[in-house]
Amino acid sequence: MTQKLDTLQAAIERVIGDRIVHLVRDRGELTLTVKATDYAAIGKTLRDHPDLGFEQLIDICGVDYSGYKDGGYEGLRYAAVSHLLSVQHNWRLRLKVFAPDDDFPLVASLTPIWSGANWFEREAFDMYGIVFDGHTDLRRILTDYGFIGHPMRKDFPVTGHVEMRYDPEQKRVIYQPVSIEPREITPRIIREDNYGGLH
């Protein structure tokens, strides 16, 4: 395993070169961080270069770093993290890119390179609000079309903004402000008369 990682790391350093922002080796895995401006081009290189051969994209997920290290993190807030697999070389790589603008997180789409990125990018858009430039059908995939916000962002309220319920009078589903009834959070302890041998 170590020799294989050495080979992969050397190939990445040779092929990608000075476009590498970070190349971290931890727990038997490599994570390559690149600039947003180089993201799509490096993705294509990772797929097409014979020494790398990452022909399969396994997953893309969004990350919100605003609460990272208990709020002590001072870098860019949003990242898209892709997991790549090379079947021919039997190795994996994590590819990370940070969106340069926290107010409007935008990175290039990988769908022209790996068509399987389609729904993963839609999920990252829906959950984190990361916009993938060049995606041909970037719309919500997990939340309702009328949903407001992006629920996996650290600043999204746990209760949400609205709740939906079926209204029998209107005979349809309606949205209304969240109404959470206060409840007692102290657990009740019920003990028998002779609990633990005590009288």
From Swiss-Prot:
Enzymatic class: translocase
Record's InterPro entries? NADH_DH_suC, NADH_quin_OxRdtase_su_C/D-like, NADH_UbQ_OxRdtase_30kDa_su, NADH_UbQ_OxRdtase_CS
- One Gene Ontology cellular component annotation? plasma membrane
| Membrane topology field | Peripheral membrane protein
> Could you tell me where this protein is found in the cell?
Cell inner membrane
Catalytic activity from the UniProt record: a quinone + NADH + 5 H(+)(in) = a quinol + NAD(+) + 4 H(+)(out)
Matches recorded under PROSITE patterns: COMPLEX1_30K (PS00542)
Q: Which family does it belong to?
A: Belongs to the complex I 30 kDa subunit family.
Q: How does it assemble?
A: NDH-1 is composed of 14 different subunits. Subunits NuoB, C, D, E, F, and G constitute the peripheral sector of the complex.
What name does the UniProt record give this protein? NADH-quinone oxidoreductase subunit C
Organism of provenance: Leptothrix cholodnii (strain ATCC 51168 / LMG 8142 / SP-6)
What gene is behind this protein?
A: nuoC
